[in-house]
Amino acid sequence: MKQKGLRYDGSIDKYPITEGETYILDNGSKIAIADITLGLPEFSKKADCVFIDPAGNKGVLKAYYTKAEKECPVQSFDEFITYIKNCIEQINPDRLFVECFARNKNQIIPMVESLFPCVKIYNNTYYHSSKNECWIVQGSKRPEDWGLEGMDEWDAVFKICKEVPFNAITDFFLGQGLVAEAAYEAGKIFYGSDMNRNRLAVAISRIVKRGGKWTINK
């Protein structure tokens, strides 16, 4: 029996996504289970924009694996950052947005600087509270300012999906689907993956509530 809390809102009962399945929308958006230490889904590599909110330290990362009922294969947080960087290099996007916190800011910023010639750092908040400080680190091929300064990260994601030009956006830590919701509302394609099937089921459910219809490719 699974621990109470790991099932989130219970969407997994209605949308029991499993390894090897891809949930697909009419516009080509896709969601699948994937652990970045084992590789990205091929469809994720077609995105030209990336937004991710990775674990902030080794303890948080280990907790994510525990909630997904998996063993954490990463020995250090620096190793985790290397996996993230490798994924971004495979995608080779035009733009990258990484949400970070005080505990991982000093590792995220140098990573983005190593990937893009132009880096901008926005001061942001989360959970709509000024007490909750975070940053969105933006990497691009030329200087850009998308007006994200001071915004809550939730609102910033919706603004990015609405205003930033891209063919498809990917989030390989999709979780419960903020990027998917924002892209869907903006009428754009998203590619989402996460190692936790229960969290992905919530994302799938949220798109259904917005009118989306999924087909399953096994």
Where are the language model's segments positioned?
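Class I S-adenosyl-L-methionine-dependent methyltransferase catalytic core
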Residues: M1-K218
